[in-house]
Amino acid sequence: MTGKLEGKVGVITGGCSGIGLATARKFVAEGARVVIADVDEANGPRIAAELGGSFLRTDVTNQAEVEALFAHAKATYGSVDVAFNNAGISPPGDDSILKTGIDAWKTVQQVNLTSVYLCCKAVLPYMLEQGKGSIINTASFVAIMGAATSQISYTASKGGVLAMTRELGVQFAKKGIRVNSLCPGPVNTPLLRELFAKDPERAARRLIHVPMGRFAEPEEIANAVAFLGSDESSFITATDFLVDGGLSNAYVTPLESDFD
């Protein structure tokens, strides 16, 4: 049976862990060839070899390195069909606006928002030449909702991703290029586990708002990315694609006693 990404070439930033790694595996399972971009030089080559793809160490805040990444994909595989701009950080220094310093603010904006701008800017010429392509930018459910457990720069950066994605999705729609934001809910990734290990109360405060009663697994988010990257989503663009277990539409979540 032919995979939904058969013959496509996907570039995945932040591809060595969490959602990025799960997506790289899903893409290959669906027939794509992948280029994995990350700063993790210890694991990147091994992961790429495991998946039959290639790895390029890439600082996504560096324009020259981002341009080299997409040039590498084009030169190696002949096209760039899907760009999953997924690299991101959520450092402990990013907290309430009253506690977050300007340096922490700038660092998060550079990695989470400026990198998406750089990746879109670098890949669009290849997709325009091809007359087709799918760009998926990782945002977050926190850009849709407010949260008292604040990460002010993270939230603002993801809001910027949503706005930029909508504009690009509309601007390039007639050129055969689709641009969508992926908005995951809380996901069971190393990044989230590290964050919540330091603050179990914060984890509990978030989990109680998820109607499904659990965090997503990376593979569940990867399924959504594969859908958005495939021709099955051919009439979907400029959207905020929520994969959040119902969190963003929940006011009161269900109790087991509700079903007695």
Regions found by a protein language model. Give the residues of each.
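Conserved glycine-rich cofactor-binding loop
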Residues: V9, C16-S17
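Alpha-helical segment proximal to the catalytic Tyr-Lys
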Residues: P125, V170-K174, S234
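Residue(s) in the substrate-gating loop at a strand-loop-helix junction
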Residues: S140
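C-terminal helical subdomain
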Residues: S181, E201-E232, I236, V243-G245
